[in-house]
Amino acid sequence: MFPSLQSFAKKVLARHHVSIDYHYILKHCGLWWYKAPISLDCKHMLIKLPSFADGLDLNTALMLATKENNYQLIKLFTEWGADINYGLICANTPPVREFCWELGAKYQVDKNKVMHMFFKLIHHGTTSSNIILCLKLFNNNPFPTYVIIREIKSSIYWKLRRLVEDTDILSNMSDDDMLTIYCFILALQDNLREAISYFYQHFKHLNTWWLICALCFNKLFDLHDLYEKEKIRMDMDEMMCIACTKDNNFLTIYYCFLLGANINQAMLACVQFYNMDNLFFCIDLGADAFEEAKALADQRNYFLMYHRLSIDIYSPDSSLLTLKEADPKKIYHLLKNYKSKNMMVYFDYDGHDTV
């Protein structure tokens, strides 16, 4: 689109720092967004706003303006060089779609552009700002969310399938919720605190999922905050089973143990998920359901696990039985360099047996 003289003048103004005394001029000119002046970094073509620490490239800014039905900014960003076809992705009402078409958008949303924008924002190593922005753009935005979910559904499904036994929960989950949980897992794994807080505040209907993810990804302090401060509750043994899904989840397993979860059920869950380190840790904590565990290992043809469970050499680790309350700082201090006593006993026995 060929820029108007007015948009060119606004572009010049946005490139320069304007004293707070003249902010009223920027508001009058339409260079005001998210309670702050719109600044333009022409070298990188980024919209600068305090609400978006990483800045917004023009196409992303256009999508956000379209999602908000901000006709003035849709036209301005398009005249500054944004691709109006990106705006069409977030056009949720007929009038906004028609406006995008008037500005030159194609009549169908480009699915490749949807995926390009999604993966540009959502990837390992991304930022809190990008994750929050992704949610603003795609939540309650049916068609592009549908496109994204169809593209990455298999990946999302198997990430979540390991966390819950009830497949009906996943089958009945909306595309919006599935996408939100996927983004939360990424934020949790990369410890993006601002994004994590945003999820807690804005998606309270998914609170149980936040608890599930904290258990599964061994996020002890998040688990404690959710359980004690947010008062999110689940069946204790179910929590323990989720903690056992990923190996080396000593922190969240121990937290559930101190809350009163059944350590023998945890032992069986470790066999079910074939998590050897977790299995030895449960034995360290006093699990003694060896016959049931052997039967399960035999049933699943886990020969190595069956062999290890068949040896009568194990006993609880008394150093783990000193804590009586689920204090995350004390748990972390106790386990930060922990090596399983019973695993070392086994390897010592196995070494001598081999000799």
UniProtKB/Swiss-Prot annotation:
The answer to whether UniProt assigns keyword Ribosomal protein to this entry is: no
Source species, domain of life? Viruses
- Decide whether keyword DNA repair is in the record: no
Biological process GO annotation list?
A: taxis
Keywords in alphabetical order: ANK repeat
Alphabetized InterPro entries for the sequence: Ankyrin_rpt, Ankyrin_rpt-contain_sf, ASFV_MGF360
The ANK repeats are at 57-89
Output the Pfam families linked to this UniProt entry. Ank, ASFV_360
Q: Which cysteines are joined by disulfide bonds?
A: none
Similarity annotation: Belongs to the asfivirus MGF 360 family.
Role played: Plays a role in virus cell tropism, and may be required for efficient virus replication in macrophages.
What name does the UniProt record give this protein? Protein MGF 360-10L
What organism is the protein native to?
A: African swine fever virus (isolate Tick/Malawi/Lil 20-1/1983)
